[in-house]
Amino acid sequence: MKDVIVVIGPWLIGQAIAATVDASSREAVHGLLDTATGLGQVTGLIHAAGVSPSQASPSTILNVDLYGTALVLEEFGNVIASGGSGVVIASQSGHRLPPLTAEQNKALATTPADDLLNLPFLQPDQVTDPLHAYQIAKRGNSLRVMAEAVRWGRRGARINTISPGIVITPLAKDELSGPRGEGYRRMIDSSPVGRAGTPDEVGSVGALLMGPDGGFLTGSDILMDGGVTAAYWYGDVPEIQ
């Protein structure tokens, strides 16, 4: 899965360098890292590459959304500058996954990236549904970031996740027009806020986490879904099958 990732140098105000990168390839991610460090210190990372249940198979979702995220965090965590910060875009979907065991949580959080997809509970006979794969991947993202916050902290840097609900983006439009679209619309209508989110709203939370006002936040997962998860567990929203 290839995603356009933009690297902005500290002196390139209003300019950017774009690179097409396979987020699930260590060689490609390391190439992006070389490009970034060639511009100077890496002071920030925003990782939003991913595929949704309506777009890909379980194996592709685990490769891009789970392994790819671990890979990016591992590589950029080796060079992030003191005072730097990062944000990974996870998903409300990770909050709908039933509880994992303590051992599974630790494995998702700390297994070296290249060994991650060898975990027994991630094998094809265990994860057969794209939505299940997506939920595991996004739960894994927040757990991974919590563990990485310790390592990043040793460099004087911070890392957090945002778990958005349904935000009007091309990916969300694919989901709303896909086989689970009716269920997602029910979730929106039945949520406390009663609407989908906007990219600007997610961006505002991202700005807080990346900037000095978020200086006491690290290893945290910000769930911003208009109350969909609250309604899912404690309201009248039917479970999506």
Which ranges hold each PLM region?
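Conserved NAD(P)H cofactor-binding loop of Rossmann-fold oxidoreductase domains
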Residues: 46-53, 227
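Short, small/polar-rich loop/turn modules that mediate ligand/substrate recognition or access, typified
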Residues: 158, 217-219
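Catalytic loop of short-chain dehydrogenase/reductase
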Residues: 50-58, 82-155, 166-169
